[in-house]
């Protein structure tokens, strides 16, 4: 529901970062701030507490982050506090990361296997995906013993399922269909 807003905030910050040639730096700073917030339960409770005023939250953010992050990122955080959206900072970071990848003609492929891919398998898969999507491909590997064997690939919500588990499931459906006749 809020993806549109997340994207608007992220795009606004991305444009500022791009103008200043600091996209990677700003992404890293946002990631660091997000990690600090998510890993400190007291800080997270503080920013989510409804009885703590916006002014107090902004003052705290200025005290904690001023001089440690860029003024643009600090201003961005203060705007999110004003708008009551600071607790969705991770969503903004994720959207900004997507915008960065789009602008660099790159996609992320989530690849699930039972055992880690060998270097040559990873290179072959990357090259095939690069040709299929006509984009640079970053492989994000995940181990998943439930797929039994084979490979499961997801790119931009498109799935390529070459797993043993899916083949067994297909065979089961065919066999059950045959019994019903």
Swiss-Prot record:
Cellular location(s): Cell membrane
GO cellular component: plasma membrane; proton-transporting ATP synthase complex
Coiled-coil ranges from the UniProt annotation: none
Keyword check for Cell membrane: yes
Membrane-protein topology: Peripheral membrane protein
Gene3D superfamilies reported for this sequence: N-terminal domain of the delta subunit of the F1F0-ATP synthase
Major site of localization recorded for this protein: membrane
S-S bridge residues: none
Keyword set, alphabetical order: ATP synthesis, Cell membrane, CF(1), Hydrogen ion transport, Ion transport, Membrane, Transport
Matches recorded under InterPro entries: ATP_synth_OSCP/delta_N_sf, ATPase_OSCP/d_CS, ATPase_OSCP/dsu
Domain of life according to the entry: Bacteria
GO molecular function terms attached to this record: proton-transporting ATP synthase activity, rotational mechanism
Pfam families: OSCP
Its job: F(1)F(0) ATP synthase produces ATP from ADP in the presence of a proton or sodium gradient. F-type ATPases consist of two structural domains, F(1) containing the extramembraneous catalytic core and F(0) containing the membrane proton channel, linked together by a central stalk and a peripheral stalk. During catalysis, ATP synthesis in the catalytic domain of F(1) is coupled via a rotary mechanism of the central stalk subunits to proton translocation.
Subunit and partners: F-type ATPases have 2 components, F(1) - the catalytic core - and F(0) - the membrane proton channel. F(1) has five subunits: alpha(3), beta(3), gamma(1), delta(1), epsilon(1). F(0) has three main subunits: a(1), b(2) and c(10-14). The alpha and beta chains form an alternating ring which encloses part of the gamma chain. F(1) is attached to F(0) by a central stalk formed by the gamma and epsilon chains, while a peripheral stalk is formed by the delta and b chains.
Family: Belongs to the ATPase delta chain family.
Name by which UniProt lists this protein: ATP synthase subunit delta
Source species: Clostridium kluyveri (strain ATCC 8527 / DSM 555 / NBRC 12016 / NCIMB 10680 / K1)
Name of the encoding gene: atpH
């Amino acid at each position: 529901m809020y993806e549109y807003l997340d994207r608007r905030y992220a795009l606004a910050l991305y444009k500022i970062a791009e103008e200043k040639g600091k996209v990677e730096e700003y992404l890293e700073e946002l990631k660091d701030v997000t990690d600090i917030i998510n890993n400190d339960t007291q800080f997270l409770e503080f920013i989510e507490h409804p009885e703590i005023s916006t002014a107090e939250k902004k003052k705290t953010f200025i005290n904690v982050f001023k001089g440690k992050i860029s003024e643009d990122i600090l201003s961005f955080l203060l705007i999110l506090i004003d708008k009551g959206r600071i607790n969705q900072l991770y969503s903004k970071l994720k959207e900004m990361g997507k915008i960065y990848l789009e602008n660099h003609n790159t996609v992320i492929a989530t690849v699930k296997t039972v055992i880690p891919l060998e270097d040559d398998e990873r290179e072959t898969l990357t090259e095939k995906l690069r040709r299929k999507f006509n984009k640079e491909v970053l492989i994000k590997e995940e181990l998943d013993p439930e797929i039994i064997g084979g490979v499961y690939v997801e790119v931009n919500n498109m799935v390529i399922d070459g797993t043993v588990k899916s083949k067994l499931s297909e065979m089961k459906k065919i066999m059950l269909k045959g019994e019903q006749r």
